[in-house]
């Protein structure tokens, strides 16, 4: 929430959950990695997150801890998604949790700068370690 990626759209996030949801559903989640994509307007980062409240994921802190088959499935989904876009998109690949956290911080700063609100957000909740 309250993020702008470099293309000035909200930062995209995919949350790994087992239960169905609905559009507009808010899930308290933390990033564990990201998939870097570039389109004509600039970077189009896709955060990969896990739900904070789900005990099945509470020992996962980085993307390399997730089943390799699931990571490959996500990559194939994002690759197929990129093919259906109306413009050229370059796929850069996976980055770790530290990169994801940095992208979130930058996107939040960009959002608040654009909205001229002065805040000093506390990012400690993004990294539970």
Positions of the model-derived regions?
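Hydrophobic N-terminal alpha-helices or hydrophobic patches in metabolic proteins across all domains
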Residues: 2-129
